[in-house]
Amino acid sequence: MADLKPYIAKAASGEPLSLEDSRAAFDIMMSGQATPSQIGGLLMALRVRGETVPEIAGAVASMRSRMLGVSAPNNAIDIVGTGGDQSGSYNVSSCSAFVVAGAGVPVAKHGNRALSSRSGAADALAALGINIEADASIIGRSITEAGLGFMFAPMHHSAMRHVGPSRVELGTRTIFNLLGPLSNPASVKRQLVGVFAPQWLVPLAEVLKELGSEAAWVVYGDGLDEMTTAGTTQVAALENGRIRTFEITPEEVGLRRCDPAELKGGEAAVNAKALLGVLEGEKNAYRDIVLLNSGAALVIAGNAKDLKEGIALAAQSIDSGAALDVLQKVIAVSNDKAA
């Protein structure tokens, strides 16, 4: 039986793990060969020292090797946040996913139930009537027929059951908060990834580059794990094999700066109602932040030359009814009915 102890000792001494060591350590944890206290020990040793790019890349490689995959077109995109930003905001990435799909880009949306907020992507989408536990073939069909498929993380990463109890008992952020967005079951090559702290912008862009992404923006929105209209968004963009960093304000792309309180969400039912409101054309701060994130995703997808054009295409997706149409089709297909 493989032994996690040498890796714990190495990490605890402050020594970084190589990508190969990290993958081996996570393979041991994800195959049920480590005790909960060993798992907790390694996770906290990494957290206290600060996880490195090779450690994250090795952990992602281990997760990806065990996941239940979903087939999706080559140009599919994901819009996802790490969670853990403690903001309690609306489900921005989920709403943006419908808008991007309505603009003609296939979306393979990966998400989970709430970890630190009151409503995660899965909670809100389930409240809208989407079957979040659809099997992989139905999700693949949903991406093809409806333009969007939702992949509920626990259904695709069953090996996570071996580390779940340790994560719950630790009750604090670990490397696993970073791994979910990087372990998309449809193996998308284009992503908009929100992070809970700015120090992760460049490292996660480097991990995505290391693991073969074609284009990605890793973003932090002044306290939010998405782009924000309540402040300045910091971006690390992976484009053509290079990473560049820049900042975006709402004003420079023609959007109103809002008060952070205007972005506060609530329980799943509240967030689902608000999401539906945006897709039905309500004009408010939630719409604006969705336009910003959707616009960025359309740039990453290659469908818009810049953020202003992306925002215009996103507005058109909502105002034409296309985004709402995607939601209705996803509800139908996920429940195994014709779209």
From Swiss-Prot:
**The enzyme's E.C. designation:** 2.4.2.18
Which cofactor(s) does the record list? Mg(2+)
Instruction: Please list the residues that bind anthranilate 1.
Output: G81, N112
UniProt keyword terms in alphabetical order: Amino-acid biosynthesis, Aromatic amino acid biosynthesis, Glycosyltransferase, Magnesium, Metal-binding, Transferase, Tryptophan biosynthesis
Q: Is Metal-binding among the key words of this record?
A: yes
Top EC category: transferase
> For this chain's UniProt record, which GO biological process terms are given?
L-tryptophan biosynthetic process
Task: Identify the Pfam families for this entry.
Answer: Glycos_trans_3N, Glycos_transf_3
Chain residues that bind 5-phospho-alpha-D-ribose 1-diphosphate: 81, 84-85, 89, 91-94, 109-117, 121
Q: What does the entry comment about cofactor binding?
A: Binds 2 magnesium ions per monomer.
Q: Which GO terms describe its molecular function?
A: anthranilate phosphoribosyltransferase activity; magnesium ion binding
Q: In which pathway does it act?
A: Amino-acid biosynthesis; L-tryptophan biosynthesis; L-tryptophan from chorismate: step 2/5
Residues bound to Mg(2+) 1 are S93, E226
One Gene Ontology cellular component term attached to this UniProt record is: cytosol
What Gene3D superfamilies does the record tag this protein with?
Nucleoside phosphorylase/phosphoribosyltransferase catalytic domain (3.40.1030.10), Transferase, Pyrimidine Nucleoside Phosphorylase, Chain C (1.20.970.10)
Catalyzed reaction equations: N-(5-phospho-beta-D-ribosyl)anthranilate + diphosphate = 5-phospho-alpha-D-ribose 1-diphosphate + anthranilate
| Superkingdom as given in the UniProt entry | Bacteria
Binding of anthranilate 2 occurs at: R167
Binding-site residues for Mg(2+) 2, renumbered to this chain? D225, E226
Q: What does this protein do?
A: Catalyzes the transfer of the phosphoribosyl group of 5-phosphorylribose-1-pyrophosphate (PRPP) to anthranilate to yield N-(5'-phosphoribosyl)-anthranilate (PRA).
| Similarity annotation | Belongs to the anthranilate phosphoribosyltransferase family.
**HAMAP family referenced in this protein's UniProt entry, alphabetically:** TrpD (MF_00211)
Assembly, in brief, is: Homodimer.
Q: What name does the UniProt record give this protein?
A: Anthranilate phosphoribosyltransferase
